[in-house]
């Protein structure tokens, strides 16, 4: 029976899965938008959202906990100096998953994962003043 077994295995070993989500979470923190498959995006929420909640209160202990989960100094710095203060008043739901069609090679459903209140960068072309 499958009672109370949460999480997906993705046909990977536990170390590979842990490494994959560690890398994806660090990329999400650094770029604030990544493209991945829908099941990986849904599973990434379980890794990334607690990190942002941790970053809302800046302390040495919280930074060390975040570093133990991300293993990227740049990502931890950005998480605590930019992203944590941005979501100070939001009680959760920091990520948005936008479906974006199928991957050409194997028709896997793809999605963008983005931070909810990320700053929008204007395109530099076609600016007429």
UniProtKB/Swiss-Prot annotation:
Under the heading Pfam families, the entry gives: Ribosomal_L17
Question: Which Gene3D superfamilies does this UniProt record tie to the protein?
Answer: Ribosomal protein L17
Which domain of life does the protein's organism represent?
Bacteria
Q: One Gene Ontology cellular component annotation?
A: cytosolic large ribosomal subunit
Q: Which GO terms describe its biological process?
A: translation
Q: Which InterPro entries match?
A: Ribosomal_bL17, Ribosomal_bL17_CS, Ribosomal_bL17_sf
UniProt-recorded Gene Ontology molecular function terms: structural constituent of ribosome
Keywords from the named record: Ribonucleoprotein, Ribosomal protein
Q: What family is it from?
A: Belongs to the bacterial ribosomal protein bL17 family.
> Assembly state and interactors?
Part of the 50S ribosomal subunit. Contacts protein L32.
Recorded protein name is Large ribosomal subunit protein bL17
Gene for this chain? rplQ
């Amino acid at each position: 029976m499958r009672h109370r077994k949460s999480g997906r295995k993705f046909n990977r070993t536990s170390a590979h899965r842990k490494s994959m989500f560690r890398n994806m979470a660090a990329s999400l923190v650094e770029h604030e938008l990544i493209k991945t498959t829908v099941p990986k995006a849904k599973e990434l929420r379980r890794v990334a959202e607690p990190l942002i909640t941790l970053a809302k209160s800046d302390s040495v202990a919280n930074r060390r906990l975040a570093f133990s989960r991300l293993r990227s100094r740049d990502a931890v710095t950005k998480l605590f100096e930019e992203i944590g203060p941005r979501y100070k008043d939001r009680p959760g739901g920091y990520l948005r998953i936008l479906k974006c069609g199928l991957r050409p090679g194997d028709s896997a459903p793809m999605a963008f994962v983005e931070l909810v209140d990320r700053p929008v960068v204007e395109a530099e072309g076609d600016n007429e003043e």
